[in-house]
């Protein structure tokens, strides 16, 4: 390859990479203020559903219209250091690595920030490339958003069951009420299904969901409202 052609190719690749990076920054900046009508995880589920979905349900609501019980339940279940870390829980990552070295059952260590980045922007792949891009988006979100916006985004796009996206749709589907009126027990059931909402049954709750929801309620009692206060004070 001629040197001049190689330089042009490298220059073109560099400009393309720079444009891609800038587009990610702009996207995250806009989503600080704009609620997304669609996101990558939901789009992939629509195109390649694990099973047939009769109806897709989703209603966006602001964080203040989501029960504080559910806010605390997902923190207790998924990321108890959410208010303290900067997107990555290094203690949880270290613990998961040690566990996975000696167990056939893999344990994850993704924070709520990482899960939000995955649901918003990423495809369902376990490659190092995907994890690297996910980490980049997580960093951008932590730099540009406050914790309450991350929690609001998570609770509005996470899947609580086949085709059921967000807290409002889940509350109305399972309990016939708005998300603002969810009780601690109901919130813990929803949070218990989050590891695999296509597998774990919320209503009537499977034995696993019953057991895990009881554990979540105990964790909620230990964390207390002070945890949520830290999240909201970070605005």
UniProtKB/Swiss-Prot annotation:
It is an enzyme of class 2 (transferase). The chain crosses the membrane at residues 12-34. GO terms for biological process: cell wall organization; peptidoglycan biosynthetic process; regulation of cell shape. It is found in: Cell inner membrane. One of its GO terms (molecular function) is pentosyltransferase activity. Keywords: Cell inner membrane, Cell membrane, Cell shape, Cell wall biogenesis/degradation, Glycosyltransferase, Membrane, Peptidoglycan synthesis, Transferase, Transmembrane, Transmembrane helix. NCBIfam families: mono_pep_trsgly. Peptidoglycan polymerase that catalyzes glycan chain elongation from lipid-linked precursors. This is Biosynthetic peptidoglycan transglycosylase. It comes from Aeromonas hydrophila subsp. hydrophila (strain ATCC 7966 / DSM 30187 / BCRC 13018 / CCUG 14551 / JCM 1027 / KCTC 2358 / NCIMB 9240 / NCTC 8049). The gene is mtgA.
